[in-house]
Curated annotation (Swiss-Prot):
Residues 162-181 form the UIM domain. GO terms for cellular component: endosome membrane; ESCRT-0 complex. This is Class E vacuolar protein-sorting machinery protein HSE1. It comes from Coccidioides immitis (strain RS). Belongs to the STAM family. It comes from the Eukaryota.
Amino acid sequence: MFRAQQNAYDDIVAKATDENLTSENWEYILDVCDKVSADESGAKDAVASMIKRLAHRNANVQLYTFELANALSQNCGPKAHRELASKSFTDALLRLANDRNTHPQVKSKILEHMEQWTEMFSSNPDFGIMEHAYMKLKSQNPNIQPPSKPTKRQITELDRQKEEEELQMALALSIKEKQSETSKQQDGSSQHVVTTSAQAEAAPSQGIPSGTTAATVSRVRALYDFQPSEPGELQFRKGDIIAVLESVYKDWWKGSLRGQVGIFPLNYVEKLSDPTQEELQREAQMEAEVFAEIKNVEKLLALLSTSSPELNVQENEEITKLYHSTLAIRPKLIELIGKYSKKKDDFTQLNEKFIKARRDYEALLEASMTHPAQSHYNRPAQPPFAYPPSGTHPGYPHHAPPQQEPQRYYTPRPSQDPQSAPHNTPGYYGAEPSTLPYPPDSQSPDFRKHTATGSMQLPQQQPSQPPQDAYSQGATTHYPPKTTYDHPQELGTSVYDSPQGNAPQAIQHSYHPAMQQELQQQQATGAEPTQRPYSPQENPPPQAPSSNPPYPVQTPQEPPQQSFAPPAPMHQPPPIPSVAPSQGAYGGGYQAYQPPTTQQHSPTSNPAAFYR
């Protein structure tokens, strides 16, 4: 009649905080959150059920209840905030924290969650009860709260030296231990080996203070939960085992936990010594006992699956005996599951790191093989230093002699000094100077000016392309429009610089009669010459005597004899095109050239034929 009304949330809250759970079951926790959000009075009933669970004497039930309350505060809004900040719930927290039988981990978890809820409810003054309860708990239990994080200070040289000394001492002890084990194994005294190894293992822990340097500490256990406040810090919970990597700051080390790497404060952890030989033997013995019960577990399972429903289990002694024998190994089995689960995670992380390192190495190796040193294969070809042969220009066929020397086609640029071609190269006029009397350049007449008989000045024919032979000097070369001459350089001028130093000094030159008649006829008809007159100012005097041979000497008839002996030539000697070596010098009479400006006098053959 006076029995309290059953709470609808007792079952689902008890399911989410069951003592048999190995960890928080978030599926059950979220089911409670969904039901509270859908019910108007769900937050009040759920908090009442959690107060009952806090009175449970099992520490796991109390810890799971704190996680459920924290999930309600984050997912159910102001309705859950109001019930969590109520006097009934805060009083239940204070009673549990002040109880001397409460586990220290439960007390620290109470203080941690009350701090979070105080910050969460600070914007609403109606929820000030939680803040007052938190301040009261801190004043009554100052040792519950986790220590403050130390400042990050750089490691001094003295600290580095101390770390190195501890490392050397640990290495020396390890070497001593190995030597002791080897000597005892040779003596055959197994009992003495166990005693010596145990003492050797205990020596480093006695000689090295706990938590001094990272050189001698491989693992630490978390004493408190740590929430990172800056990038690079490692998050962990109380009880986690952290692998130590190195020391970074004065009171901060770098460690690895569940695949994450970061720094953590030393006052939040405690050093874990490496297991001794005795501890390893106890672990191996415990594993052997667990695996020895496998047959009994399988036998018990077979009996229970084949028994009839009418069978009374309590009366069956075999089933009862098997059940109690297998029940004793359950705590050991859970411990081994946790141990090998941790090892499995460590091996998985190690494998992932190895795979990543191998991929990075292969990528770098492939990149170094596919990108060799810079080569010059793809560079464009450099242009030649000589001008192309005149035969490549349209309208000027080139009669190159076979097997010419490369020097014959080289023509320096105007800014370069010309190179003299060999005087006796086959294919040049005057290759045999002993058969032709060549006058020196000082005795060569200048027929470009008007003669005494009124003959007009010979126009200067300039090549349409740079000369090929060595006749060209450093003067600027002009390029007039294309003409119909095969070898226009032969008619450029009549003055040549003879390369023969022993030629006669007083030979007189004049035009051939046919040439003179042609010039007079051109002057009478008023035809305009197609070649520009020579200007001494345009071309500087040659710097070296030219190897260009002059025209063949004929008996002077008309006009009157004229001789010129200038002190030095004031013009550029014109080069002549090459002629096939099979063609010799012309031995007949001199024939005049007819300019192409008049149609009736247009040449019908190569102009070079007049000189052969």
